[in-house]
From Swiss-Prot:
The keyword Lipid metabolism appears for this protein: yes
Keywords: Glycoprotein, Hydrolase, Lipid degradation, Lipid metabolism, Secreted, Signal
Entry's transmembrane regions: none
Gene Ontology CC entries for this record: extracellular region
Protein name in the entry: GDSL esterase/lipase At2g24560
Organism encoding this protein: Arabidopsis thaliana (Mouse-ear cress)
GO biological process: lipid catabolic process
Glycosylation (residues): 25, 103, 325
Extent of the signal sequence: 1-22
E.C. number: 3.1.1.-
Amino acid sequence: MSTSKTITFTLFIAALLSSCDAATNATSQPLFPAILIFGDSTVDTGNNNYHSQTIFKAKHLPYGIDLPNHKASGRFTNGKIFSDIIATKLNIKQFVPPFLQPNLSDQEIVTGVCFASAGAGYDDHTSLSTQAIRVLDQQKMFKNYIARLKSIVGDKKAMEIIKNALVVISAGPNDFILNYYDIPSRRLEFPHISGYQDFVLQRLDNFVRELYSLGCRKIMVGGLPPMGCLPIQMTAKFRNALRFCLEQENRDSVLYNQKLQNLLPQIEASLTGSKILYSNVYDPMMDMMQNPSKYGFKETKRGCCGTGHLETSFMCNAFSPTCRNHSEFLFFDSIHPSEATYNYMGNFLDTQIRVWLSLRLKS
């Protein structure tokens, strides 16, 4: 099914579901017993705060300025990130804690944690340059989590929780930015972007299979956003005073996402009992870029922090001026969406998940 048909079908089903049983959607019962998060800064809720090797941290203002306590938590935006928003919409919990956070309660462990690390990617080269926690090492953290979970609820119950948990994987942009587009360290090995895409997808395939071997069955894998519309990419390929999306990088994202959509059913078919969902982030984000007023956005080509052209992580700090109304900006810094954007994305993906569950129950 083409991307346009997929999004149309999803929105049609969403309207159908919302008109059927409002009480069901409003139930306080969680749709999954736990949520387990892997990936990069789009889903890292603060693991890098406790990872001394990396400089990619968000434990300072203005990050977190719109959280309830107005304090930075390690999330790379002004408030909640996607991890928290989707966990809230699925009635699991309001905030997903980072696994490396000291003194996590038993309840936090039982209902799920985040293993993601800002700066990570599927390609090990990515973490070499960022010193983020490699995806492979996130898997090792997950093994430690399983041991802790078993000590709390016992072996059988622990594996039941993991089997029924929603696993979210969000990574990929750092691989292309740091190894191909801006720092071409992989271009000699892969002269054509298609070859590097296949390499990254093979690493993704291996990672999903490893999670399956550890007991995960319900897995949502995120595609790439419109990479050429990230403010930092517009800056990196600066041509004139008019900032615009880089069409070639967007076409690359579309091609990667098409390959990913073809790959995931193959992985699912080979892993008995697995249920794997492609998370479409490209289309809703592109719609926000092209129709900003529909979402209340006034700025889509630069971030809210500093100039919005380059600042991220330590470059976006307490001395950086910020925009007056954070919710009017699609991006909070030069890479990361604002909480408002994550909210819209969360609404879209919540619909995807509910449609997915509905169709699975009937199959």
